[in-house]
Amino acid sequence: TIIQGELGTKLFLQNLLNQTSVCFDTETTGIDALNAELVGMSFSWQKGEAFYVPFPENNGEAQVLVDKFKPFFESETIEKIGWL
């Protein structure tokens, strides 16, 4: 499922913050972490179901979206499983 728009993002974040364990991955423009741009993030907490959040090309708009995920990444009650 692709998450789009402010309402879609808000509803997705509410659902995300209610999970106990989440697998996530970042999609970037390259493998060099110092120079790559974030283009999206994917999340899954249930077998066979995943969500993709595309990021705007504009760095300012992308940062606003990244900041909305701060409560998820800073939560100590949600296990985060990164994909390599």
Residue ranges of predicted features:
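Long, highly charged low-complexity segments
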Residues: 1-41, 55-72
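Functionally constrained cores in energy, signaling, and assembly domains
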Residues: 6-9, 44, 80-83
